[in-house]
């Protein structure tokens, strides 16, 4: 029943555009389990008064504009829900609507290219009154996106029990509000906080704490609207998460869904065929912030003869980066007996590396992970070309300088790759026999010699 939604297979609580609605608003609902129309039974539930926090949400979204951490699609989608309550009726039915004497006050907005007119109301109460009147007069309508009370509970038997209050008992929390505070529960469980522990607060309340939530674009309503309103209303000092919506990851050419005919692969199925590092670097380069992307694991789709695209990004590490690392260690052993040479990194290599570090930091702050891959790819391929050119020298001093320069690139690349492919990078650190300060961002511009004693 939502303007713009054409889905006939939506869940009972939301349309495919993410809008929440009441069961009474459904048009000819049919149960997916029984194939029969469901019975409407009066129930009592708890709701969060989300519309009461409209001003807070508007101020919050306004503060995000111009901040590169917040994607344009996120802001646009949230703004769609911050409109006044509206009803859409066909333009040819507008005269019938205006003849209903008891209709609450509304203003009409029309767009020439649209078949419907929008009836805009002052508040949700007036809109709901109008809905009842339209149904009474058998006038077809659709409701528009707006803030509505957010349901907290349900009457299914499984789930987390809602504490009894005001004589209401026997309810369980609805899955969506539970999922909003679940990351806090996970944090408490991971830290071993128990019920009364406070360690979790340093991750959710401390001034330097910041949670980032990477979500599907169809869940913006829950994490970008309901969660922010709920956390603010609790007034317990929770830091608002940064919401990072992404487009759909298609399985092959199809949008997979646990409720659809095409099911997404389970994590264990993927891990039986690929390493976590292969998957992580592949997803990093997927450009999901810009468009829906096809995920085509050859091992699961059984594509005979085709190149496995999941391995493409990993080849940057296993081939290009690994080639540079092996060249450095083998040459160090051959020409310097495994002792790191004294000297400083040449200015062009140091300047280029510093530039890459700063660009990496900028891209990370904007979640531009695909651009990150391009940056590191070019950095390492240029280093390999430089190695091929300079390694031909027979001058021992030039070879020592080559090692200092290339080990600096290895040191920088290992630190930048560490969040993405930690296992391989940890192996490099162990071969270098240096401590974990290598990963500390406050030392990111330091040369390799900084982490070593003399004659290392």
Feature map (PLM): residue ranges:
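Amphipathic alpha-helices that form helix-helix packing interfaces
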Residues: 321-324, 328-331, 352-356, 360, ...
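Acidic/His metal-coordination segments adjacent to aromatic residues that form catalytic metal sites
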Residues: 257-264, 302-307, 354-367, 392
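Secondary-structure edge/capping motif, primarily at the C-terminal ends of alpha-helices
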Residues: 332-335, 339, 360-367, 383-394
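Structured secondary-structure scaffolds
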Residues: 4, 30-334, 372-376
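Non-transmembrane, amphipathic alpha-helical segments
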Residues: 309-316, 345, 361-371, 398-402
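Basic, alpha-helical terminal appendages of large translation-related enzymes
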Residues: 1-19, 23-24, 29-34, 97-103, ...
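Non-catalytic interaction-recognition regions
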Residues: 284, 343-350, 355, 362
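Short acidic alpha-helix initiation/capping motifs at coil-to-helix transition points
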Residues: 52, 258-263, 351-353, 405-409
